[in-house]
Amino acid sequence: MIEASVFMTNRSQAVRLPAEVRFSEEIKKLSVRVSGSDRILSPLNQSWDSFFLNDQAVSDDFMNEREIAFQPEREAL
């Protein structure tokens, strides 16, 4: 497991990431999602980019058996 250190700088808390897990230099802002005691950092406005640009796709059977919502018939206007 890779570890990072947390420290105070002025009145803010900062995280020092090891070189092997640093964000690229063009990333200047991050979104922070809180899940219990976890903090999940993602490049701001790019959280879906990595999914769509990733070479790995979903499996061929992804959502094959999803339920189709029933659409009730409406009265004519």
Swiss-Prot record:
GO molecular function: DNA binding
Effect of D61A: Increased antitoxin activity for VapC2
All residue ranges annotated as the SpoVT-AbrB domain in the record: 4-46
Keyword Coiled coil applies: no
Highest taxon of the lineage: Bacteria
Alphabetic keyword roster: Toxin-antitoxin system
Subunit structure: Probably forms a complex with cognate toxin VapC2.
Protein family (similarity comment): Belongs to the VapB family.
Described purpose of this protein according to its UniProt entry: Antitoxin component of a type II toxin-antitoxin (TA) system. Neutralizes the effect of cognate toxin VapC2 but not non-cognate toxin VapC2.
Protein name: Antitoxin VapB2
Species the sequence originates in: Haemophilus influenzae (strain 86-028NP)
